[in-house]
C-alpha cells in the first residue's frame, strides 16, 4: 500500500473516531443542559418568540418583592438601565428561582435565561455593597462630583460593552433553546465576566511583580526574529517606571490583579502534548513569564480532545503566535516611557525657571505608559492564546467550537481591559488638572502664561549673545527688543490633556532693554513712558533720550484680543474654538529728538481669513502707522501697508531686508521733498509673513482634544491681487526691494537705491542720486545735476542734461550723457561703452575692453596699463582741445603706429592683442569731424600733440617709439598743471558735488569724497593723495587737485 493510501486510511480512521467522540461529547452536553429544564419546558417553548426578540439584549431582572431600599444605590441602577435602553423586567420570585436552578446562575449577578443575557438585580446590588471599590474603578473618569446615577450608568454600560465583545456572532436565542457548544461558550463567557468583575474589585497592588514580568518578556522577545529592538526597549522599563506611588496606580494594580487571577492555570497536571496542541508551550517561549491559561474546564473539555501535535502543526502554531504579537504595540508602550523621560529631562530646566508644567506632562506620559504597558502586554498574551489555539485546532473536527470558545473568552477579557483603560487615563489627567487649579489658586496667576514666562527667560539666556549685539550692529546706544513667545506644543498638550484649553493663549509678547551689551533688568528712567500694548496695537518710545533701536526680534502676532470656548463635538471629541477680535493697525510713536532705527521686518501684517478657488487666499491687513522724530532715522519695512511720517533729519526707508513685493515708488505728484506713494505687488512668488489659525490635537485614550491657536508662517501669499500701499512723508532716501522695482522721482532731489533685481530708476527733475546696485538696471537722471551708480550687472546709465556723474561699476555697462555740461563717466570693470555730450567730459573706461566716445567739447580721456583694449572715437570740432592722459605709462614704453585710418598705441612689453589703445579715424580726412586727440600726456607730464604726430607720419609711417614724437620738456610741471585745471573743473561740477550741503543731500561728505577720489586715483598720477576735509559743505578747491597732480608727477 502506498504512503498516500496509508495516509488517507489513517485520516479516515481518525475522522471516524473524532466523530464518535464529538457525538459522545454532544450527547453528554445535551443531557447536562436538559437537566432541570424539563420542569420548565413548557415555559421555554412558550417564550420562543420572546427569546428571538430579546435574546441578544441585556435585561435587568428584578423580583417583584425585592426591597431595594437596603441596597447600594439600587434605584440608581434601575434608573441607569432605563436611561441606557436596557429592559427592566419585574418577575415573580418562583419564576426567577426556576431560571437560576435550570441554568446554574443562582450565585451570579450575570447569567443566561430564556429572556437572554440577564442582570439579576439582587445579586448585582449585593455585589456592589460588598465591593464598593468597583464603582471607583469603573467610574473614576467622572470625578467626585458626578452623581450616583452617572456611576450606575457607567457600571451597567461597561458590562454591556464587554458582553457585546465576547458574545459577538453568537445567536443566543438559538443557543438557549437548542443547547450545544454555543450555549456552553456563552455560559463560560458570562461566568468569566462575573469572575473578572469581582476580582478587579478585590484587587491589590501587585504592580512590582508585573514590572519583573515585563522585563522578562523583553529578554525573551529580544531573541525572537524581528523583535530584538522591541525587546531591548522593554527591558529599559525599570521598577520605578511602574512605581505604585505614581498617579492612578491604585486602579492599574487592581485591574492587573483581577486579570492575572483569572488566567491562573488550575490544571497544573495537564500533559505537555496537550499544552503544545493548544499553543501554550510555544506562546510561553515567545511571550515569556506572563501566565496565559484558561480555566481547567476549557482545558479538559476542549483543547485536549484529539488535536494534532505533529511538527507541521507545531510550526503553524508558532507562526500564528508570532503574527499575533504586534511589535508596534510594544514600541508604542516603550515610546510612551521614552517620551516621558524626554519631557522629564526637558522639564528640569524650566522647573528652575518657575514652571513645572513640563514635569506634570512627563508624569502623565509616565502613568499613561504604565497603563498602556499593562493592557498591551496582557492583550498580546491573549492574542497569542487565541492564535495558538486556532492553529493547533486547524485540522480537527472539533476545531471550530474550540476556536470560537477561546476567542470569545480572550475577547471578553480584552473588552474589560479596553473598557477600563479610558477611566484610568482620565483619572490621571484629572489629578494633573487639580494640581494646576491648586497652583493658580495659590499664586493668583494663569498657569500656562507662567509657562510662557519661563520659556522667555530661557530664550534670553540662550540668545543673549545675539540680543546684546544689536546695539553695535544697528549703531545705536540702546535697543528696545520685542519678542513673541509663540505657541508651545508642550504647554498646549498639557492644556488639552487636562481639558483647560480655554485658559490658554496663542503666546505672549515681551519687551526687553539692552544697553552696552547688557540686559537692563528694570525699565530705565528715560523709558518710564514706554508703552507696548499688543491688545490695542500701540507702541510708544518717544521719551527715549538716547539713540534707540526698536526691533521685533521674532514675528509678532497681529494686535487684538483672544477668547476661547471648549465644546463637545462627539462622544469623546472636544474642540476649543478661538475667536480673535483684531485691530486694523499698529501705531508707533518714535524717539523725538535722537536718531533711531525701526526694524519692522518681523511685524505680521496679514491675518489669513479664508481660501477659495475664485479669490485665492484672503487676508485681514493690519496697517503700520509710524511717527518718527527729528533725528536721522532708518526704517526697515515689512510686507504690509505702512504710513511713515519721518520728521526732520535725513531719513531712510528700506525695502530690501525681507520680501516686500514688487515696488513702484512714485514721487511725480509730490508737492514737497520726501513725499512718495509706494505700491507693492505681493502676488506671485512673493513670500509674506501671514498669521494663520492652526490646531493641536492631544489624546487621553479615546478622548481627543483639539485646540485652535494663532501662529504664523512665511509663505507665498496665494492671492494674485494682493497689494500693499505705503505713504512716505519727509523721507530723503529709499532702498528698493530685491525684485524688479520702478522708481519715479519727484521734481526735488531723490535718492534711490535699486538693491537686487533688474530695476528702473528715473530721477526726473532735481539733482538726483541713483544707485542700481545688483542686477541689470536702467538709471535715468533726466534734468538736473545727477549722480548715477550702476553697481553690479550690465547697466544702462543715462545722465540727461546737466552736470552728471556716472559710474558703471562691474558688468558690461553703457553710460551716456546729454547737453553741454561737465560730466564724469567711469566704466569700471567689464566691457563698457561711454558716450559724452557736447560739454567737457571725463571718460575713464576702467578695466575691460571699452569704447569711449567724447563727442563735442574738450574732453579728457584716461588710459592705464590695466585698461585692456580700448577704442576712443572722438567726433569733436576743430576748436576742441581733447586730452588723453596715460596714467601709468611713459612715452619710452609705448609704441605708436598707423593702422588704416587709426592711430594705435600699445606697450612695447605687450602683445598685439592685449593692452592696445586705438584712436579711431585719427587719420581720416574729408569729413566735418575732428577725430584727433589734441594732446597726449604721459605720467611724467611730457606732452605729445596731434601736429607732431601728423608731421612725423607723413615722413615715416611706421611703428616707432612714442618718445621720438614728444616734445623735449622732461616732466614738465606746466603740462601737469593744465591737466589739474581740466580735472578740477569737471569734477567739482559733475553731479553737483561742489555745492553739496548737509541739508540738501544727507550724504556723508567723506563718502562723496571717496567717490571723487576713485575718479582721480584711477589715474595713477593722483594715487598718493586724498581730497581734504571731513566736514560738510563745499568740497576741496582746485589747488588740492593741483597738489595731487604735482606730487604724483614728481613721484613718477
From Swiss-Prot:
GO terms for molecular function: calcium ion binding; channel activity; toxin activity. It is a multi-pass membrane protein. It comes from Actinobacillus pleuropneumoniae. The Gly-rich region is probably involved in binding calcium, which is required for target cell-binding or cytolytic activity. The three transmembrane domains are believed to be involved in pore formation by the cytotoxin. This is RTX-III toxin determinant A from serotype 8. InterPro entries: Hemolysin-typ_Ca-bd_CS, Hemolysn_Ca-bd, RTX_C, RTX_pore_form, RTX_toxin/Mannuronan_C5-epim, RTX_toxin_determinant-A, Serralysin-like_metalloprot_C. GO terms for cellular component: extracellular region; host cell plasma membrane; membrane. Disulfide bonds: none annotated. Gene3D superfamilies: Serralysin-like metalloprotease, C-terminal. Keywords: Calcium, Cytolysis, Host cell membrane, Host membrane, Lipoprotein, Membrane, Palmitate, Repeat, Secreted, Toxin, Transmembrane, Transmembrane helix, Virulence. The keyword Membrane applies. NCBIfam families: RTX_toxin. Belongs to the RTX prokaryotic toxin (TC 1.C.11) family.
Amino acid at each position: 500500500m502506498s504512503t498516500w493510501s496509508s495516509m488517507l486510511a489513517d485520516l479516515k480512521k481518525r475522522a471516524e473516531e473524532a466523530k464518535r467522540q464529538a457525538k459522545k461529547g454532544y450527547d453528554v452536553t445535551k443531557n447536562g443542559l436538559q437537566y432541570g429544564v424539563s420542569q420548565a419546558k413548557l415555559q421555554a417553548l412558550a417564550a420562543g418568540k420572546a427569546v428571538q426578540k430579546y435574546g441578544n439584549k441585556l435585561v435587568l431582572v428584578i423580583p417583584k418583592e425585592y426591597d431595594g431600599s437596603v441596597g447600594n444605590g439600587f434605584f440608581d441602577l434601575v434608573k441607569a438601565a432605563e436611561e441606557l435602553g436596557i429592559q427592566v423586567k419585574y418577575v415573580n420570585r418562583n419564576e426567577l428561582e426556576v431560571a437560576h436552578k435550570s441554568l446554574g446562575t443562582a450565585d451570579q449577578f450575570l447569567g443566561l435565561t430564556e429572556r437572554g443575557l440577564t442582570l439579576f438585580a439582587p445579586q448585582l446590588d449585593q455585589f456592589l455593597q460588598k465591593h464598593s471599590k468597583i464603582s471607583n474603578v469603573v467610574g473614576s473618569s467622572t470625578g467626585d462630583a458626578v452623581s450616583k446615577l452617572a456611576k450606575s450608568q457607567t457600571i451597567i454600560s461597561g458590562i454591556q460593552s464587554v458582553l457585546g465583545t465576547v458574545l459577538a456572532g453568537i445567536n443566543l436565542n438559538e443557543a438557549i433553546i437548542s443547547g450545544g457548544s454555543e450555549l456552553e461558550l456563552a455560559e463560560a463567557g458570562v461566568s468569566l465576566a462575573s469572575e473578572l468583575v469581582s476580582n478587579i474589585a478585590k484587587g491589590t497592588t501587585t504592580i512590582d511583580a508585573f514590572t519583573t514580568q515585563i522585563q522578562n518578556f523583553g529578554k525573551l522577545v529580544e531573541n525572537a526574529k524581528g523583535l530584538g529592538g522591541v525587546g531591548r526597549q522593554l527591558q529599559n522599563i525599570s521598577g520605578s517606571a511602574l512605581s505604585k506611588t505614581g498617579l492612578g496606580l491604585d486602579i492599574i494594580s487592581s485591574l492587573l490583579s483581577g486579570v492575572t487571577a483569572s488566567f491562573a492555570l488550575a490544571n497544573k497536571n495537564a500533559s505537555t502534548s496537550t499544552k503544545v496542541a493548544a499553543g501554550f508551550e510555544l506562546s510561553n517561549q515567545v511571550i515569556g513569564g506572563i501566565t496565559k491559561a484558561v480555566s481547567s474546564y476549557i482545558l479538559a473539555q476542549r483543547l485536549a480532545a484529539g488535536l494534532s501535535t505533529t511538527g507541521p502543526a507545531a510550526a503553524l502554531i508558532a507562526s500564528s503566535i508570532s503574527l499575533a504579537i504586534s511589535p508596534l504595540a510594544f514600541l508604542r508602550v516603550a515610546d510612551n516611557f521614552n517620551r516621558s523621560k524626554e519631557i522629564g529631562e526637558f522639564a528640569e530646566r524650566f522647573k528652575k525657571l518657575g514652571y513645572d508644567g513640563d514635569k506634570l506632562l512627563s508624569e502623565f506620559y509616565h502613568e499613561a505608559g504604565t497603563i498602556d504597558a499593562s493592557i498591551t502586554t496582557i492583550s498580546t498574551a491573549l492574542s497569542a492564546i487565541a492564535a495558538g489555539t486556532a492553529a493547533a485546532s486547524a485540522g480537527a473536527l472539533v476545531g471550530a467550537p474550540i476556536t470560537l470558545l477561546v476567542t470569545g473568552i480572550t475577547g471578553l477579557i480584552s473588552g474589560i481591559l479596553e473598557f477600563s483603560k479610558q477611566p484610568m487615563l482620565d483619572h490621571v489627567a484629572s489629578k494633573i488638572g487639580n494640581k494646576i487649579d491648586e497652583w493658580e489658586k495659590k499664586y493668583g496667576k494663569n498657569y500656562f502664561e507662567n509657562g510662557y514666562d519661563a520659556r522667555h527667560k530661557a530664550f534670553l539666556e540662550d540668545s543673549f549673545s545675539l540680543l546684546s549685539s544689536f546695539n553695535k550692529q544697528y549703531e545705536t546706544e540702546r535697543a528696545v527688543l520685542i519678542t513673541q513667545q509663540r505657541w508651545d506644543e508642550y504647554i498646549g498638550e498639557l492644556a488639552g490633556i487636562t481639558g483647560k484649553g480655554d485658559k490658554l493663549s496663542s503666546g505672549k509678547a515681551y519687551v526687553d532693554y539692552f544697553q552696552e551689551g547688557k540686559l537692563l533688568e528694570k525699565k530705565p528712567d528715560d523709558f518710564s513712558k514706554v508703552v507696548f500694548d499688543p491688545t490695542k496695537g500701540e507702541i510708544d518710545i518717544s521719551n527715549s533720550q538716547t539713540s534707540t533701536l526698536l526691533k521685533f526680534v521674532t514675528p509678532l502676532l497681529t494686535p487684538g484680543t483672544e477668547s476661547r470656548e471648549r465644546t463637545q463635538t462627539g462622544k469623546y471629541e472636544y474642540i476649543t474654538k478661538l475667536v480673535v477680535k483684531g485691530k486694523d493697525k499698529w501705531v508707533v510713536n518714535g524717539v523725538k529728538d535722537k536718531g533711531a532705527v525701526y526694524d519692522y521686518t518681523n511685524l505680521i501684517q496679514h491675518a489669513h481669513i479664508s481660501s477659495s478657488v475664485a479669490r485665492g487666499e484672503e487676508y485681514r491687513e493690519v496697517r503700520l502707522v509710524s511717527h518718527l522724530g527729528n533725528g536721522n532715522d532708518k526704517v526697515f519695512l515689512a510686507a504690509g501697508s505702512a504710513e511713515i511720517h519721518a520728521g526732520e533729519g535725513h531719513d531712510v526707508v528700506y525695502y530690501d531686508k525681507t520680501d516686500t513685493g514688487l515696488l513702484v515708488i512714485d514721487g511725480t505728484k509730490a508737492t514737497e521733498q520726501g513725499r512718495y506713494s509706494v505700491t507693492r505687488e505681493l502676488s506671485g512668488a512673493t513670500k509674506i509673513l501671514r498669521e494663520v489659525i492652526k490646531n493641536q490635537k492631544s489624546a487621553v485614550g479615546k478622548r481627543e482634544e483639539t485646540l485652535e491657536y494663532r501662529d504664523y508662517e512665511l509663505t507665498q501669499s496665494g492671492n494674485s491681487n494682493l497689494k500693499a500701499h505705503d505713504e512716505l512723508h519727509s523721507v530723503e532716501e529709499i532702498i528698493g526691494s530685491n525684485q524688479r522695482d520702478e522708481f519715479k522721482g519727484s521734481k526735488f532731489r531723490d535718492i534711490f537705491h535699486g538693491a537686487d533685481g533688474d530695476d528702473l530708476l528715473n530721477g526726473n527733475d532735481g539733482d538726483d542720486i541713483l544707485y542700481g546696485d545688483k542686477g541689470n538696471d536702467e538709471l535715468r537722471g533726466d534734468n538736473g545735476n545727477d549722480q548715477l551708480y550702476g553697481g553690479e550687472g550690465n547697466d544702462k546709465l543715462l545722465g540727461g542734461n546737466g552736470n552728471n556723474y556716472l559710474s558703471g561699476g562691474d558688468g558690461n555697462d553703457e553710460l551716456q550723457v546729454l547737453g553741454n555740461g561737465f560730466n564724469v563717466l567711469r566704466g569700471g570693470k567689464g566691457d563698457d561703452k561711454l558716450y559724452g555730450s557736447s560739454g567737457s567730459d571725463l571718460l575713464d573706461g576702467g578695466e575691460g575692453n571699452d569704447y569711449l566716445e567724447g563727442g563735442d567739447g574738450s574732453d579728457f580721456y584716461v588710459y592705464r596699463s590695466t585698461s585692456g583694449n580700448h577704442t576712443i572715437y572722438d567726433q569733436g570740432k576743430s576748436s576742441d582741445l581733447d586730452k588723453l592722459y596715460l596714467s601709468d605709462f611713459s612715452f619710452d614704453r609705448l609704441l605708436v603706429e598707423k593702422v588704416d585710418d587709426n592711430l594705435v598705441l600699445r606697450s612695447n612689453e605687450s602683445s598685439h592683442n592685449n593692452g592696445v589703445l586705438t584712436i579711431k579715424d585719427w587719420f581720416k580726412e574729408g569729413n566735418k569731424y575732428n577725430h584727433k586727440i589734441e594732446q597726449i600726456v604721459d605720467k611724467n607730464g611730457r606732452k605729445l600733440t596731434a601736429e607732431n604726430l601728423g608731421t612725423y607720419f607723413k615722413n615715416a609711417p611706421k611703428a616707432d617709439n612714442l618718445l621720438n614724437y614728444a616734445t623735449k620738456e622732461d616732466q614738465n610741471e606746466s603740462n601737469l598743471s593744465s591737466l589739474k585745471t581740466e580735472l578740477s573743473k569737471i569734477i567739482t561740477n559733475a553731479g553737483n558735488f561742489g555745492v553739496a550741503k548737509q541739508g540738501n543731500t544727507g550724504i556723508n561728505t567723506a563718502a562723496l569724497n571717496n567717490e571723487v577720489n576713485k575718479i582721480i586715483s584711477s589715474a595713477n598720477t593722483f594715487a598718493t593723495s586724498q581730497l581734504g576735509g571731513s566736514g560738510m559743505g563745499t568740497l576741496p578747491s582746485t589747488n588740492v587737485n593741483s597738489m595731487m597732480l604735482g606730487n604724483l608727477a614728481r613721484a613718477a
